[in-house]
A protein has these predicted regions:
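Short, small-residue-biased leader/transition segments that mark boundaries at the very start
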Residues: 1-8
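A catalytic-pocket lid/entrance helix-loop region that shapes and gates access to the active site
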Residues: 9-18
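Hydrophobic alpha-helical scaffolding
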Residues: 11, 47-51, 140-144, 168
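Rossmann-like dinucleotide-binding domain that binds NAD(P)(H)
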Residues: 19-99, 173
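Glycine- and acidic
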Residues: 41-47, 75-77, 135-140, 159-166
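NAD(P)-dinucleotide binding in Rossmann-like oxidoreductases
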Residues: 83-87, 94-149
Length: 188
């Protein structure tokens, strides 16, 4: 038999309840790459780095753009055809809102023409590493109050029955955004 077919002939470790691990995902024979950290590379469980960490990057972008209460009307991808089981690379995903605002995500394999801003707006540009063209930005940030740590803020909101700043609807919007991107990749 070939090495490729042997990859699915692995014994499930005795300390792993593989059926519980799979949960509602479709059954696939055990393979060490389908569990632990590498499960993120399979569509059955995740959508790669985009859906694994994407919402954490999209939350502040949506907030800064005032898009917490809306969704894009168009999603375009620049990517090779995705494998049916394994998450592949993508070069770019462009989310366009009804007002023309765009969020552009650059992925692996994207070759930008020069330095591309992380956030760009009418007051300036913010680049990776917080390099910024906004005049006096550090002074403006220093004037802002320090936010409560999220876990402290969350517990206080539960105790006082107040809305949490990062509520479930904002989380839903950011999660939906990256999942729509993953769907667009698969339909590409």
């Amino acid at each position: 038999s070939s090495a490729a077919s042997d990859v699915y002939k692995r014994q499930v470790p005795s300390n792993l309840d593989y059926d519980m691990w799979l949960g509602p995902a479709p059954y696939k024979p055990y393979n060490k790459h389908r569990v632990h950290a590498t499960f993120r590379g399979y569509w059955d469980y995740d959508g790669g780095g985009l859906t694994d960490m994407g919402q954490h990057y999209m939350d502040p972008v949506q907030y800064l753009l005032g898009k917490d209460d809306t969704s894009p009307v168009k999603i375009e991808v620049d990517a090779p055809q995705q494998h049916p089981d394994a998450v592949g690379i993508w070069r770019k995903i462009v989310y366009t809102y009804d007002d023309g605002c765009q969020i552009v995500l650059e992925g692996e394999g994207y070759e930008s023409k020069g330095k591309v801003p992380y956030i760009e707006g009418p007051l300036g540009k913010v680049y990776q590493g917080f390099e910024c063209t906004i005049p006096d930005v550090m002074e403006k940030i220093a004037e802002m109050p320090d936010p409560e740590p999220q876990n402290t803020d969350f517990l206080a909101c539960v105790r006082n029955r107040e809305p949490f700043a990062l509520d479930e609807l904002k989380g839903h919007r950011s999660s939906t955004l990256v999942n729509l991107g993953a769907c667009a990749l698969r339909l590409n």
